[in-house]
């Protein structure tokens, strides 16, 4: 019987759930700490209650991650000390060192936003070098499909795992239930899955309702329990291409000038009048007129001495 139970446990799908953005709203985040301790928290290092919430979570035996702000491709307000691809290794080391000090007991890191940073291979190589010195794993939130995190970890001792499902892209409870069930199905099909959510009241309510009814073949685990699960590198070599910018004054050819007023129609009488005036004023007609009037004749011979 014991062997059967061990075999069943080995075949069970493993589901890991991480709650991001912790450290700003303790009154809401405390509800997360009432859930099973396998639910992990990712704490923003510069949040006002970062140290408090990390300490509370750790005291429960809960896994703590640093939720590191990283630069996105889109323009939006950024957290202080957001990692940028162009930063030097020393600057990235400094920021990560401060984050480790601000989030005690952290055993891993995941990215807050970060589509620009995680798609930069040189940038992520600097991050992995820093993480290796603190023996932290990296949970790739996969905010962009071409993340270079797994590729950047090659040659280091840093383990990389990947998010499969976002629970609460919307705060609609029905949508969150759909995403939770999707995470369960992926864990069952692939052997494991990581879902990321946020401490919204709607997310907390759905988890409170659905965790007690988790299927028997699904086991709730910490992210670090999945570090030896096989990971597929879906990235493309190189970093994300910068957006194409248009020149300030692109030449688009000469534009036709629009008449200020529509052209007036020309009637037949006016047409012949204009023709008559033009003919009468022509040089040839005036010449014949002058000849007819005698201006072109020779003068009479003089009669006197």
Annotate each language-model stretch with its function:
Residues 53-56, 146-156, 230-238:
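Glycine-rich, charge-decorated loop segments at or immediately adjacent to ligand/cofactor-binding or catalytic sites
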Residues 133-143, 202-304:
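C-terminal domain-boundary segment and adjacent tail
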Residues 1-6:
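Bacterial N-terminal signal peptides
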Residues 25-29, 49-53, 73-77, 117-122, ...:
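Extracytoplasmic/secreted cell-surface and envelope-processing proteins
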Residues 55-105:
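Substrate-binding cleft of extracellular glycoside hydrolase catalytic domains
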């Amino acid at each position: 019987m014991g062997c059967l139970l061990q075999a069943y446990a080995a075949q069970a799908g493993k589901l890991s759930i991480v709650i991001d953005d912790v450290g700003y709203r303790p009154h809401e985040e405390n509800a997360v700490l009432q859930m099973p301790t396998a639910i992990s928290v990712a704490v923003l290092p510069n949040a006002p209650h970062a140290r408090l919430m990390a300490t509370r979570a750790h005291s429960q035996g809960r896994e703590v991650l640093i939720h590191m702000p990283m630069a996105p491709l889109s323009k939006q307000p950024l957290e202080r000390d957001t990692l940028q691809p162009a930063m030097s290794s020393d600057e990235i080391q400094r920021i990560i060192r401060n984050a480790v000090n601000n989030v005690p007991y952290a055993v891993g890191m995941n990215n807050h936003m970060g589509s620009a940073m995680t798609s930069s291979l040189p940038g992520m190589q600097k991050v992995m070098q820093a993480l290796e010195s603190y023996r932290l794993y990296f949970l790739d939130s996969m905010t962009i499909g071409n993340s270079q995190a797994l590729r950047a970890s090659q040659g280091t001792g840093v383990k990389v795992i990947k998010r499969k499902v976002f629970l609460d892209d919307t705060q609609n409870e029905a949508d969150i239930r759909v995403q939770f069930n999707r995470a369960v199905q992926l864990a069952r099909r692939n052997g494991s899955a990581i879902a990321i959510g946020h401490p919204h009241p709607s997310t907390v309510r759905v988890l409170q309702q659905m965790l007690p009814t988790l299927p028997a073949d699904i086991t709730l685990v910490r992210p670090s329990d999945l570090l030896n699960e096989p990971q597929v590198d879906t990235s493309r070599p190189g970093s994300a291409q910068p957006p194409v910018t248009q020149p300030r004054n692109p030449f688009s050819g000469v534009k036709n000038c629009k008449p200020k007023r529509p052209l007036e129609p020309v009637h037949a009488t006016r047409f012949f009048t204009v023709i008559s005036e033009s003919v009468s004023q022509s040089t040839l007609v005036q010449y014949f007129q002058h000849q007819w009037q005698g201006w072109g004749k020779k003068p009479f011979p003089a009669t006197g001495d």
